[in-house]
Amino acid sequence: MPSSPVRIGVVFGGASGEHAVSIRSAITVINALQEGQNRDHFEVVPLYIDQEGRWWPEHIANSVLEQKQPLAEDSLPHPLPPAGFRSLPIDNDRVDVWFPVLHGPNGEDGTVQGLFTLMGQPYVGSGVLGSAVGMDKLAMKAAFAAAGLPQVPYVGLNVADLNHPERQNKLVARIEAELGYPCFVKPANMGSSVGISKARHRDQLLAGLKEAARHDTRLVVEHGVSARELECAVLGRQQLKASVVGEISFEADWYDYETKYTDGCSQTLIPAPLPDQVSAQIQAIALQACTAVHAYGLARVDVFYDEKSGDIWLNEINTLPGFTSQSMYPMLWEASGVALPDLVAQLVHTARE
């Protein structure tokens, strides 16, 4: 007798600034899980988390997937339950493996991973530790530094430092002395370039700190380097493997949210035109970065490469990378010989190891 399909609980949406990206990623993942031979092996059970953190069952999730954007509140069943997670909207024995397609806080940061761990059910991606450290840029950078991995200079701070004029002035002076301009101001716990700004002088730095503080209480300011932006994808658990290296090129001043998710605003070069030795170095750094934060399953590692000096700087790791039409993670594996349906199947099988 043929075996029963593996039931995949695809969770998407989420109470984060990357809600819209998550919906787009989920559409890609679900289509891949239902393509070709996967249709016989997997049964998709979609669950939607709205922007207030409420979990909704399949019929609501399917409506969101069909219209490719969040439902208006008056389209949701009333009376609305309280915001936040209360319970699963389905029996958890309906799911064999969870596939979180969540970006940003409350999904990529170890919170949902902790829930699945408590439930005793397998899930795609890193565990609680790797997800949490990989989400918080300050914790991530500390782990990279402890592993001896190269990074651009940076300064970390708490929003409380900005609420006292004297402390803020000292902090700004330190940033200018240690990093100079240009520099990039980032919330520690956001992705997809949400809340990030480039500062070329003090007024822009102050404005950037204020904007980043809208998204997080922990911030990081990084020295801006003139370098190529390269990415490498990682797959596996017991034995991690790295994809070919890809490059993002764009006309904009930097790789912001609009450039990242608007068709035609950026171009990808896969594989990136690099000497073999440089590609091998970047692949090695990608694997070392995963080990440093205890990431596994899937990850995308971003680096800067200065052609003139030959320097490679580790930028960040993303433990739940996007799966949109502009997302590098699936494209990097496609160029490495792993088609999207095979990729999602491997991710599910890895989760069950």
UniProtKB/Swiss-Prot annotation:
Pathway given in the UniProt record: Cell wall biogenesis; peptidoglycan biosynthesis
Enzyme class: ligase
Chemical reaction(s) catalysed: 2 D-alanine + ATP = D-alanyl-D-alanine + ADP + phosphate + H(+)
Cited InterPro entries: ATP-grasp (IPR011761), ATP_grasp_subdomain_1 (IPR013815), D-Ala_lig_Van_CS (IPR000291), D_ala_D_ala (IPR005905), Dala_Dala_lig_C (IPR011095), Dala_Dala_lig_N (IPR011127), PreATP-grasp_dom_sf (IPR016185)
Annotated Pfam families: Dala_Dala_lig_C, Dala_Dala_lig_N
Names of the cofactor(s): Mg(2+); Mn(2+)
Subcellular compartments: Cytoplasm
Coiled coil: none
ATP-grasp domain: residues covered: 141-349
Binding positions for Mg(2+) 1 per the UniProt entry: D302, E316
Keyword terms of this UniProt record: ATP-binding, Cell shape, Cell wall biogenesis/degradation, Cytoplasm, Ligase, Magnesium, Manganese, Metal-binding, Nucleotide-binding, Peptidoglycan synthesis
Record PROSITE patterns: ATP_GRASP, DALA_DALA_LIGASE_1, DALA_DALA_LIGASE_2
Gene Ontology biological process terms, A to Z: cell wall organization; peptidoglycan biosynthetic process; regulation of cell shape
Cofactor remark: Binds 2 magnesium or manganese ions per subunit.
Gene Ontology CC annotation, any one: cytosol
Disulfide-bond pairs as recorded: none
Chain positions recorded as Mg(2+) 2 binding sites: E316, N318
A GO term, aspect molecular function: ATP binding
Annotated function: Cell wall formation.
NCBIfam families: D_ala_D_alaTIGR, PRK01966.1-4
Family: Belongs to the D-alanine--D-alanine ligase family.
Full protein name: D-alanine--D-alanine ligase
UniProt source species: Synechococcus sp. (strain CC9311)
Classification of source organism: Bacteria, Bacillati, Cyanobacteriota, Cyanophyceae, Synechococcales
Gene: ddl
